[in-house]
Amino acid sequence: MICIPIIDNTVEKALISAKEALKYGDIVEFRLDLLDNLTKFDIEKFAKIPSIITIRANWEGGAWKESNNKRIEFLKHAIKHGAKFIDVELKEEKNLELVTYRNEIGSKTKIIVSYHDFEKTPEINELIDVVEKELKIGDIAKFATFSNSKKDVLKILEVMNKYPGDIIAIGMGESGKLTRILGLRFGSILTFASMKGKSSAPGQIDVTKLKEILNLIE
């Protein structure tokens, strides 16, 4: 599965971008923390589209400036209205509250629990510890760490390979591009690619180019 991040700053632009992106990818990620004047009604629109709903906290590299309680309520609203996936941080104290709410209302939303390190890739045992903690909370574990070397790439791929079908793992940065290309073969449920000029993280590959590469190595 190829996921294309939507990083526009208005609801109208985001919906237009998503329609275009789904011509190339299988799913989109709505970065709702980047939007101006987000409402629950807007979330209902986004939840109807095959997507990951992400409202990234500012303490995890995101742009959310309002209260955390409002952020959690918006994520619950996405669950209530049938979003395919939501993404919540491992460090978010209320992540289990979202899982409990999902279970109570019988929603089919899958919950991705995520971890980010924008400077380095931790050692394998640390990454495994992160993934195990995430899987005790949600349905899918995700980590995105900055890859500074080929060794970091190998660490990421090795951990991916231990959790096929239950993980999304990404090496950010130039050397991490290999994880975006090989991730699907090593067990990641999806890989991220960008529309031209709209990257949400360092090292993201243009979706057209990524599809060409994936076709070559199939």
Swiss-Prot record:
The keyword Amino-acid biosynthesis applies. Pathway: Metabolic intermediate biosynthesis; chorismate biosynthesis; chorismate from D-erythrose 4-phosphate and phosphoenolpyruvate: step 3/7. It is an enzyme of class 4 (lyase). GO terms for biological process: 3,4-dihydroxybenzoate biosynthetic process; amino acid biosynthetic process; aromatic amino acid family biosynthetic process; chorismate biosynthetic process. The keyword Signal does not apply. It comes from the Archaea. 3-dehydroquinate binds at residues 29-31, 56, 180, 200, 204. InterPro entries: 3-dehydroquinate_DH_AS, Aldolase_TIM, DHquinase_I, Type-I_3-dehydroquinase. HAMAP family: AroD (MF_00214). This is 3-dehydroquinate dehydratase. The lineage of its organism: Archaea, Methanobacteriati, Methanobacteriota, Methanomada group, Methanococci.
